[in-house]
Amino acid sequence: PDRRVLFTGDLVFNGGTPFMVMGSVTGSLAALEHLSSFDADVVVPGHGPVCDMTVIERLRRYDEFILDVATRAVNDGVSPLEAARDTDLGEFSELSDSERLVGNLHRALFELAGAEPGAPIDLVAAIGDMVAFNGGKPLTCLA
C-alpha cells in the first residue's frame, strides 16, 4: 500500500479479452468495483503488462458491454453464438482472444436466466461455440 501498487491476480486482463465462463459477470463487476476503491498508481494484472488504474474502468465497461449484448440476445431470442456474430466489438476489438466473447455471453445469458453467479454452465457448448466463432480453428491463449 505504501508504494501504491495493486496486485490483482486473475481479476484483471490488460490487453486480452477477459474470460468469465467459469466465473460470473456480475461477480466480476463487483470485484472491479472493489478494486477501484484502491488508490494505486501501478496495477500488476494477472494477465498482460503492468499498467495503471484505467484498466479497471476499461474492464468494467467490457463487463457492462457483455451484459448489454446478452440482454439484447434474450430480447431477440438468439443464441450466444448468433449474438456474438452480430456484435461490433467497438472499443474492445483490439483485445486478443476475441472468441472469448461467445463464452462470456454463455455465462451472462445463464445468469440472466436466473442461475446463481458462478454456477456451472455447459462448457462443451460454450467452448464449441467459441471454436465456431473462431472459424473452426482451435483456440489459443496468450495469457
Segments (PLM) and residue ranges:
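Residue-identity detector for glycine
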Residues: 2, 9, 15-16, 23, ...
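Electropositive phosphate-/nucleotide-binding environments in soluble metabolic enzymes
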Residues: 60, 64, 77, 99-103
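C-terminal regulatory/interaction regions
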Residues: 80-143
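Metallo-beta-lactamase
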Residues: 1-72
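Hydrophobic alpha-helix feature that most strongly marks membrane-spanning transmembrane helices
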Residues: 40, 75-78, 88
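Short, charged, surface-exposed loops that flank catalytic or proteolytic processing sites
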Residues: 71-83
